[in-house]
Regions:
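Short, conserved, GDST-rich strand-edge loop motifs in beta-rich repeat architectures
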Residues: 143-166, 246-291, 354-357, 441-472, ...
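N-terminal secretory signal peptides
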Residues: 1-25
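Beta-rich, blade/repeat-based domains predominating
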Residues: 123-133, 221-233, 320-331, 418-430, ...
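Beta-propeller fold recognition
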Residues: 161-163, 167-169, 182-193, 347-412, ...
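Beta-propeller blade signature
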Residues: 169-177, 296-305, 352-353, 474-484, ...
Length: 552
């Protein structure tokens, strides 16, 4: 978790998720005895619970129904704060793709004081989302190699140092080969780095518009940055997501003022990007000297791992915000549906639905990620919801161009009436078309308007425990929903899958700050954490049974 995730730029009067949950609780006994009561209402699944980490597989100390189903029949291990990863005894681990490893298959690494040119030829820093394709080509995001990681200090002192940090960001594409029980990089023409200065293309409704016009490299856009989660398409490409791009922009001109649109995207002023301070040496990231460069970031970027000479393509029909994931699902009629969260407090959940069968679109020379409609989620207290269209066809947005809506997606979603969420993170599809979304947390507190502090309200829902006591939940939760019409419809039913404060074993609360999530299609849901854990322990990877909500 990073400080920029904890910003709030949403000043709209839209309802928060807590508003919805509280209203629902008023209508009926909601979450009495835990998240499972809500789950039973619409989905027929059992309450979230945990297994005893000190007993063998199949023993369950959690409340509610559901002995170990066999789907997650390994030994659960207790929380710990050790210096090295701890894993269940049924598994083994090995390290692959460390920072600085060369992409030539030699297995060697450049020194810690490598040059920017060497960094462009080696694995980047700050690993995040990834996908391993069937031919064992891996695409791996590098989200946030900081100055301290690179130099052991917080400042940069030259353009070369800026270039080195820039080269550590982006995506690594490598072909792997199995060696015993692990993998190694093999020499392959597809191996490459995609970084902040890699040439890129734009497609979709914003391509060719004045929104992307800059003074520097006007017709030669470059780069991807802060690559967090990801997705993959049915046609074999990788989609990577630009998240906290605001933290790289600023200005040496301290009189520069951010526009309202920039403030809505969390660029508050000339010192916004002072942590990295690229603008001190690279004029491209100085918004006084190079307006609109920020509007070239915040997109979903498509990469073809089989075509190393093809430019990455920024798909603007998917909207611009702090994308945390782009989960691509094949919906009814073989239309592709792309789900994304916007990872900042009080931001929204989105989905894009292609205009037609993806194979037919491609046969006509069109990208399924360019032709379609973007929607934003509005949750309702009765456990239903609607996807509000973000286009001029929506009467609330009729006065805006489609290009404006895609560049200023957050502002458009404000107007459309989206529900404020608790830092929406990764989204995954499980069995029976159920979608799952992690909401890390929302640690905002009610500010004091009398002191001039904005009255931001956390969207976190509280819940009532089995004894009927109200329990605050600042540790995040996981929701699930099912869309109408095989993912393509504009209505849905939603409910909780788990509330972090409630999932416990005999030692107490089991996890907090859920972040990454992936369902394997066999009834297992994998959840990784990123942030404060119970007892200040290490982050962790958990597995839950989709049907029983049992966690290990």
């Amino acid at each position: 978790m990073h400080d920029h995730d904890d910003e709030i730029s949403n000043e709209s009067e839209n309802q928060t998720f807590a508003d919805i949950v509280n209203a629902r609780a008023t209508r009926r006994t909601f979450l009495a005895g835990g998240a499972g009561v809500a789950a039973l209402s619409f989905f027929g699944t059992a309450p979230a619970h945990a297994t005893n980490p000190n007993k063998g597989p199949g023993n369950n100390s959690g409340k509610g129904k559901g002995a170990d189903s066999g789907r997650i029949g390994f030994t659960s291990i207790p929380l710990n704060d050790g210096p090295l990863p701890t894993i269940a005894p049924e598994y083994a681990m090995s390290v692959i793709l460390p920072w600085r490893e060369k992409l030539d298959g030699s297995g060697e690494s450049y020194p810690y004081d490598l040059t920017s040119e060497q960094q462009e030829k080696s694995v980047g820093l700050g690993h995040d989302g990834m996908w391993l394709f069937d031919d064992e080509v891996l695409c791996l995001n590098q989200e946030y190699g900081t100055n301290f990681h690179m130099f052991g200090r917080n400042d940069v002192r030259s353009l070369e140092e800026v270039r080195k940090v820039q080269a550590a960001h982006g995506v690594t594409v490598v072909a792997l080969e199995r060696v015993g029980d692990t993998y190694k990089v093999k020499r392959d023409r597809r191996n490459r780095r995609i970084h902040v200065n890699t040439p890129v293309e734009f497609s979709g409704p914003v391509a060719g518009t004045s929104f992307l016009t800059t003074k520097i490299d006007n017709h030669n856009p470059k780069g991807t940055v802060n690559n967090c989660s990801m997705g993959h398409t049915p046609w074999g490409t990788y989609v990577t997501c630009e998240e906290n791009f605001d933290q790289y922009f600023g200005s040496k001109d301290k009189t520069w003022k951010a526009t309202d649109e920039q403030k809505r995207m969390s660029i508050a002023g000339p010192d916004e990007g002072k942590e990295y301070a690229w603008f001190e040496y690279d004029e491209r990231f100085d918004l006084a000297a190079n307006p609109n460069e920020d509007q070239r970031f915040g997109w979903v970027v498509e990469i073809d791992p089989q075509k190393p000479n093809q430019k990455p393509i920024k798909r603007t029909a998917l909207g611009r915000f702090k994308h945390e994931g782009a989960t691509v699902v094949e919906g009814r009629g073989k239309r592709v549906v792309v789900y994304s969260g916007d990872d900042e407090r009080n931001e929204y959940i989105y989905k894009f639905v292609s205009a037609g069968n993806w194979k037919s679109l491609q046969a006509r020379g069109k990208s399924p990620l360019d032709e379609g409609v973007l929607y934003v989620a509005q949750f309702k207290e009765d456990g239903t919801g609607v996807w509000n269209e973000l286009s001029p066809r929506n009467p609330k947005l009729a006065h805006k161009s489609l290009a404006w809506i895609m560049v200023n997606t957050r502002a458009a979603a404000d107007i459309a009436g989206a529900t404020k969420m608790d830092r929406p993170e990764w989204i995954t599809v499980g069995q029976n078309e159920e979608m799952f979304c992690t909401l890390t947390n929302n640690n905002a507190t009610n500010a004091n308007p009398a002191k001039g502090e904005p009255g931001h309200r956390p969207a976190n829902p509280a819940y009532t425990d089995a004894e009927g006591k109200p329990v605050a939940n600042s540790d995040g939760h996981i929701i699930k929903w099912v869309d109408a019409d095989g993912h393509t419809g504009t209505t849905f039913h939603w409910d909780f899958f788990a509330i972090a404060k409630e999932v416990k074993d005999e030692n107490g609360q089991m996890f907090g700050s859920p972040d990454g999530i992936w369902a394997d299609g066999k009834g297992r849901v994998f959840v990784e954490t990123d942030g404060t854990q119970p007892g200040k322990n290490n982050d962790q990877l958990l597995v839950a049974d989709q049907q029983t909500a049992e966690f290990k």
